[in-house]
Amino acid sequence: MTSSLLRRVAAPLLSLLALALAGSLVAQTSSAPAAAPAPSGVARLDPTMGASQGAAAALTWHDVTTWGLEGREWTERPRLRWFDRFPAEAQKTVTDKVWNLSRDSTGMVVRFRTDASSIHVHYKLMKAQLGMPHMPATGVSGVDLYARNTKGEWRWVGVTRPDTQEVKVEIIKDLAPGLREYAAYLPLYNGVESMSIGVPAGAAFEGLAPRKRPIVFYGTSITHGACASRPGMVHPAILGRRFDLPVVNLGFSGNGRMDAAVGAFLVDIDAAVYVIDCLPNMGPGGVTERTAPLVRQIRKSRPNTPIVLVEDRRYTNDWITPGKAKFHDENHAALRAAYEGLLQEGVKGLYYIEGDRLYGDDTEGATDASHANDLGFMRQADVMEPVLRAALAASR
């Protein structure tokens, strides 16, 4: 083959190769966004069953740490992570399990006022596990948004549906015009590394500082939030909206045991009322041993703050499991005896909530017999509300 013929054959091939290389270079340097991954499972058939939609462009982002959260106490003390429930010093005094659980952001609420037509949130989660077998990602790792209506009542707006550890999504769009107050509840069983609220550029926005004198709940996995469908459906959150008061959630899954080390932090809070709801993690012996010392510990530092003692809920299948029914009977009797003993000592400002109907009496209030579903949380709030109302009235 002559050199002239070789040149004629090779020239088209070289041109094609150059075009391919140029196309590859353009693909690597293009600023066009990558296509979103195709939805899987049922979300292919019903988009409302998929993850939240991504955040829009042209937003102004507001870092929530610049004005603070409700449910985050001891703000003047150093923290290992800004969104931890306890300050760093607690790691040396509480149990390892309580410390690890305290890194979940349950009970924290960010409040703000805006006239935005849409609201977005960008947050990074501490843990990659977004949900649990008996609790959805919306509850474990979601951000749950409420707003005040024209009557000043809190009403639900929307919740994120996370499917990644970093969430940057639109919570709600097409909002009715007007300036209104919002409250966003942080995840129940995950921690938060950072969080910002996004609104369209030009929208009015004001971060609202945390309110004082919260209702303080100390309890177990149920107080922690298991198994609410979303963060605003836990009974401390429900009661906070009903009373329009801030709440501190010190629920520690499997580890709410009336620990004196936790009590040392409780007494540092200028609370409107303390709710002690630890029996689901305790037996009769522990209840007898620890109830009175914890109450005395609180009373020593907070002589006038009401204290509410709560019996544990009954397993919703204890009607057919005699051993569980007997355990609840004995646990309740132990708390009742401790309560009556404290009254005889002259301790004032004590209140008592019975546990038999915390979940109702139809067996439908729990996800797994032990942990509340949304119905169970609403029922707990209904039972607790009148007692808390009386306690709050007495403390004013």
Model-derived segments and their meaning:
Residues 1-6, 12-16, 21-214, 389-396:
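N-terminal secretory targeting modules
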Residues 131-136, 225-233, 326-329:
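Glycine- and acidic-residue-enriched helix-capping/strand-helix junction motifs
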Residues 212-236:
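Catalytic nucleophile-elbow at a beta strand-turn-alpha helix junction centered on a G-D-S/GDSL motif
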Residues 218-220, 250-253, 276-281, 310-314, ...:
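Active-site-proximal beta-strand/loop segments in catalytic clefts of secreted hydrolases
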Residues 236-249, 340:
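Short helix-loop-beta junction
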Residues 239, 256-301, 312-319:
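Oxyanion-hole/transition-state-stabilizing segment in secreted/luminal serine hydrolases
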Residues 268, 313-396:
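Catalytic His-Asp segment of secreted/periplasmic serine-dependent ester chemistry enzymes
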